[in-house]
Regions:
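Non-catalytic C-terminal accessory region of glycerolipid acyltransferases
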Residues: 5, 9-13, 23, 150-265
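Membrane-anchoring hydrophobic helices of lipid-metabolizing enzymes
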Residues: 6-98
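Catalytic core of membrane glycerolipid acyltransferases/transacylases, capturing the structured
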Residues: 44-68, 79-80, 94-148
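A generic structural signal for well-ordered alpha-helical segments
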Residues: 77-78, 138, 159, 191
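Short gly/ser/thr-rich secondary-structure transition/capping motifs
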Residues: 79-87, 146-150, 210-213
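A generic structural signal for alpha->beta connector loops
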Residues: 82-84, 119, 140, 163, ...
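Alpha-helical membrane-embedding segments
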Residues: 85-101, 133, 155-158, 198
């Protein structure tokens, strides 16, 4: 009886120790996240001062630099026990003319994808241009702020015509705690109109964390596990063969919404 009690006490102590270890590692991770953002503002000065607009080689240099840093940051989070991550089919990303559509369960989705496939361009929230640390990264890499303007659509067309791949999170914001995935049709319309191929990427995480508005100190009781799976290609011409763009976009949007919901539950 005493032995059983001691084992329970020891197990609870180890759980508590693991919790506080991850708590400290998460705190340090957020500090690193902020410090890296400030350092980027300095390191990327050669790109932001001279500009990289229409200069794809220099944009790619900046993306590789940022990708290496975010891959290192993700590596720290894995090493410290904050999370684990498993990739399936990552080699299928980054192809010319490819639109990558991913669901968006957490803050770290961009970090994990860009850290491992840095050559992708990305549509980002326009509000991020008001964030000093993020503005430098957006300007240096040629990422496209989402203002839903005609100029933005022309930039997207130019991205695909130049042989780049493009990452979009069609939810527009992080998935809520209820797990309901709602996609904006605009991302699908972009793919049907301009991309050579559309590739869905399903991001699963358990337990949920790093949600919008969530305090950093609200960490889960165990290590977070990410599984990022690249789905099968979707060919725009197959969806446009029988229906005009608006109807095809609506149908594909419903299909993808069902796909992400099914794959994440």
């Amino acid at each position: 009886m005493l032995r059983k009690t001691l084992l329970v006490v020891a197990e609870n102590f180890m759980k508590l120790l693991n919790y506080y270890r991850r708590f400290v590692a998460t705190l340090f991770g957020f500090i690193l996240f902020g410090v890296v953002g400030v350092l980027f503002k300095i390191v990327l000065l050669p790109y932001t001062l001279n500009g990289t607009q229409n200069d794809i080689p220099r944009q790619m240099q900046a993306r590789r630099l940022i990708g290496r840093v975010w891959k290192w940051f993700a590596g720290y989070l894995v090493w410290s026990g904050v999370l684990t991550v498993r990739f399936n089919g990552l080699e299928k990303l980054g192809r010319p003319g490819q639109l990558v559509l991913a669901n968006h369960p957490s803050l770290l989705d961009v970090v994990l994808l860009i850290g491992h496939v840095p050559q992708m361009n990305c549509i980002v929230k326009k509000d991020l241009l008001n964030n000093p640390s993020m503005k430098s990264q957006i300007l240096a890499t040629g990422y496209i702020p989402n203002d839903e303007s005609l100029e933005m659509m022309e930039e997207v067309d130019a991205v695909f015509k130049s042989g780049q791949s493009l990452l979009i999170f069609p939810e527009g914001t992080r998935t809520g705690w209820d797990g309901q995935i709602k996609l904006h049709r605009g991302a699908v319309s972009i793919g049907l109109r301009s991309a050579r191929v559309i590739t869905p990427v399903c991001i699963k995480m358990n337990p949920p964390n790093f949600k919008k508005g969530q305090p950093w100190y609200k960490i889960p009781p165990r290590t977070i596990h990410y599984e990022i799976t690249v789905g099968d290609d979707i060919h725009p011409q197959d969806w446009l063969a029988e229906k005009p763009l608006p109807i095809a976009a609506r149908r594909l949007n419903i299909y993808l919404q069902d796909y992400f919901t099914r794959e994440t539950t």
